């Protein structure tokens, strides 16, 4: 059955379904990282919370794109979500570097989609991508890059990593730090 509301939504914009998949994949990767750092033998609660929050954010992005597809009268075509390439994330520096690489991949995919929307003259899609995704993506890349720099200064393992995680915990888990056991 054809959509009654689809208007000026070119079929070349259907790759938005691939972006939905990429956002859910990113959520899946961050969820894996969050639970990895929550393990009893790793125990970095600040990192765990940071990555779990990142997972929630990426899932929300996927859902926002799904709502947009429906709003424009397009069809949502969900694809299988690939498993993360790693199950063991190493130290926090390694995980943050993987997160930065992932954010850059998501950003490039959004830029490609934005270029397609501009090429086929779809101002609605261009406006949505530029207003709701691209700026936030640049901020995420900057945030993770800054975290990597600060972690390198503190030391990427041992006491430096522990102290850095303590700072993350204070930023992302204020209720745990305000009531010491």
UniProtKB/Swiss-Prot annotation:
Subcellular location, principal: cytoplasm
Q: Can you state which reaction this protein catalyses?
A: 4 Fe(2+) + O2 + 4 H(+) = 4 Fe(3+) + 2 H2O
Molecular function (GO) terms for this protein are: ferric iron binding; ferrous iron binding; ferroxidase activity
User: InterPro entries this protein is in?
Assistant: Ferritin, Ferritin-like, Ferritin-like_diiron, Ferritin-like_SF, Ferritin_DPS_dom
What does UniProt give as GO cellular component? cytoplasm
Look at the named UniProt entry and state the broad enzyme category this protein falls under.
oxidoreductase
Q: Where does Fe cation 1 bind?
A: 23, 58, 61
Q: What is its EC number?
A: 1.16.3.1
Tell me yes or no: is Aminoacyl-tRNA synthetase among this UniProt entry's keywords. Answer: no
Q: Keywords on this record?
A: Cytoplasm, Iron, Iron storage, Metal-binding, Oxidoreductase
Q: By its UniProt entry, which SUPFAM superfamilies does this protein fall under?
A: Ferritin-like
Residues that coordinate or bind Fe cation 2: 58, 103, 137
Family, according to the entry, reads as follows: Belongs to the ferritin family.
Q: What does this protein do?
A: Stores iron in a soluble, non-toxic, readily available form. Important for iron homeostasis. Has ferroxidase activity. Iron is taken up in the ferrous form and deposited as ferric hydroxides after oxidation.
Miscellaneous notes: There are 2 types of crayfish ferritin subunit: a 19 kDa chain and a 20 kDa chain.
Can you name this protein?
Ferritin
Please give the organism.
Pacifastacus leniusculus (Signal crayfish)
């Amino acid at each position: 059955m054809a959509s009654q509301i689809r208007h000026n939504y070119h079929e070349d914009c259907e790759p938005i379904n691939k972006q939905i998949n990429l956002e859910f994949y990113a959520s899946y990767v961050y969820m894996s990282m969050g639970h990895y750092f929550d393990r009893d033998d790793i125990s970095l609660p600040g990192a765990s919370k940071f990555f779990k929050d990142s997972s929630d954010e990426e899932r929300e992005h996927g859902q926002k794109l799904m709502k947009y597809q429906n709003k424009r009268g397009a069809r949502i075509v969900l694809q299988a979500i690939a498993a993360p390439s790693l199950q063991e994330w190493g130290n926090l520096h390694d995980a943050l570097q993987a997160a930065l690489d992932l954010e850059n991949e998501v950003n490039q995919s959004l830029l490609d989609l934005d270029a397609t929307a501009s090429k086929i003259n779809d101002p609605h899609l261009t406006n949505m991508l530029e207003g709701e995704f691209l700026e936030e993506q640049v901020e995420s890349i900057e945030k993770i890059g800054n975290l990597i720099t600060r972690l390198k200064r503190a030391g990427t393992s041992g006491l430096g990593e522990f102290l850095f995680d303590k700072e993350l915990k204070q930023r992302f888990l204020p209720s745990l730090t305000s009531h010491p056991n």
